[in-house]
Amino acid sequence: MQLVQLANFVLDNLVQSRIGFIVLFHCWQSDESLKFAEQFMKPIHPILVYHQFVQMRGVLNWSHLELNYMGHTQPTLAIYVDIKCDQAQDLLEEASREQIYNQHYHWLLVGNQSELEFNDLFALFNISIDADVSYVKEQIQDNNDSVAYAVYDVYNNGKIIGGQLNVTGSHEMSCDPFKCRRTRYLSSLQKRSKYGNREQLTDVVLRVATVVTXRPLTLSDDELIRFLSQENDTHIDSLARFGFHLTLILRDLLYCKMKFIFSDSWSKSDVVGGSVGAVVDQTADLTASPSLATEGRLKYLSAIIETGFFRSVCIFRTPHNAGLRGDVFLQPFSPLVWYLFGGVLSLIGVLLWITFYMECKRMQKRWRLDYLPSLLSTFLISFGAACIQSSSLIPRSAGGRLIYFALFLISFIMYNYYTSVVVSSLLSSPVKSKIKTMQQLAESSLTVGLEPLPFTKSYLNYSRLPEIHLFIKRKIESQTQNPELWLPAEQGVLRVKANPGYVYVFETSSGYAYVERYFTAQEICDLNEVLFRPEKLLYTHLHRNSTYKELFRLRFLRILETGVYRKQRSYWVHMKLHCEAQNFVITVGMEYVAPLLLMLICADILVVVILLVELAWKRFFTRPLTIHP
């Protein structure tokens, strides 16, 4: 055996693969092993390779092969196996049982078997699609100093789902005692990446777990597939159908067949039952219906790519008795501004009285007023000017008229700012409820209904949030005997429209379509919305140890990059309601006018009371004195 040339070939292969650790299973003599190791440790090589020799002679049991011989913490460990050894077949069979022909091990299987013999040996082995297995066939050259090594790429698209062994010639190396060089290519493998050469799964039938909630599972598979394939009524089972259509695109990219496994829920608990449980126990290779990537699931699954958006909300119209606001006419200014403005008006009222007094006492008779107004009258003039009211009394002096000019100017500025703020407030969208969180909703007196979705019930059962526990106690447990607690999305949305104050909990991908169907644009803007649960992204999942992980990730990225994913998502997933308030006129309701009318009524009552007091005062306390002769 030309061990020096073989050592050079192995070292060159490790350099090209960027691997620095190798375990060599061999049946050489001690001096041959020493010669091979000496060639490894020569300083002419560009890298230092950690190597470990395992003598296969005398090993009767290869059980726990990975645990006993391949323990490592490296991303990839190289494994050399001399398949000419008698014990090599038992070792390779055990590796197949333990499913370690995968991307974490770089296998170099060296022998001189023909391709047909190698196919017969490996046809039954469980070699994965991500396997990094190379069969190396050696042939000694005529000059006896160089050895030719033909390298073949070996993989299987999936033995347990119908895949066949694939052995493709890659290239040929010629090695002498000093160096190795590539002499020729045996195929076009080098023109593409590893997964570029393995992207077509024409010989396998992928098992795909799919959720169907809007149709009974008693229907035939063809009927369920026909329902999921439809493109109308996107609000019915939209998440499941969105994922199903993405899976059909993946099927076309991989040129494979698919067998769909149907279930009526994502899972019974976090990782048991449903489509998620099917992937966890490896009865399915992929989930077509996107699901949440929870902490418990990520122990068994890998999230490949984001393929959905999960959003549950509570919508309701503001109750008629919840929108009365008495402070809308005071909001433009803070209390301090109102106090200062009142003080300025009072000061001007005093200055006006002083002005009128001086004009009556000091000016010429032809310029004097007919009478001196009281201090109360000047206060009334001042506050009337603030309300854009004129006055029958006008100062005749230059100073008095300057006071009037300042009064009307400041009143004009304040009035215009005040009216602009009030009008914009009154003509904006009608008053919204102050309920913004689940805690406030649970503490309110509003009636609640829910859409009967499995993940909503699961969230109520397993959520640890205190506001959800309070919501269950006050809104759910009190209605356990109410048959209308769980309502279909269409009925729930119609009840929200008919009953202000009725709260309906639904998933946006299904419920928003009914809202847009039954509500006008103005009514949509009037709706209150409370987030039922934190917004979550949905992912397509594979088993954590799935050999298709990288291939599927690359294919889904291709779907994302070409814009196909965005098109499908915009068609199937409704993210938000569109409120276009500028397209209609909003009328001012009683929630704003009622406080104003109440203020006017109170003022009228006060005026009548004052009038009665004045009449009584005049009648009983200001009687004319009777003079007797």
From Swiss-Prot:
Extracellular side: 1-335, 396-402, 614-629
A single cellular component GO annotation: sensory dendrite
Cytoplasmic-side positions: 357-374, 424-592
Main location: membrane
Free-text tissue specificity from the UniProt record: Expressed in neurons in the antennal coeloconic 2 (ac2) sensillum class of sensory hairs (at protein level).
One GO MF term: olfactory receptor activity
Location within or outside the cell: Cell membrane; Cell projection, Dendrite
Membrane-crossing residue ranges in chain numbering: 336-356, 375-395, 403-423, 593-613
Membrane topology: Multi-pass membrane protein
Keywords (A to Z) from UniProt: Cell membrane, Cell projection, Glycoprotein, Membrane, Olfaction, Receptor, Sensory transduction, Transmembrane, Transmembrane helix
GO terms, biological process: detection of chemical stimulus involved in sensory perception of smell; sensory perception of sound
Keyword Transferase in annotation: no
Family affiliation: Belongs to the glutamate-gated ion channel (TC 1.A.10.1) family.
UniProt protein name: Ionotropic receptor 75a
The species this protein was found in: Drosophila sechellia
Taxonomic lineage of the native organism: Eukaryota, Metazoa, Ecdysozoa, Arthropoda, Hexapoda
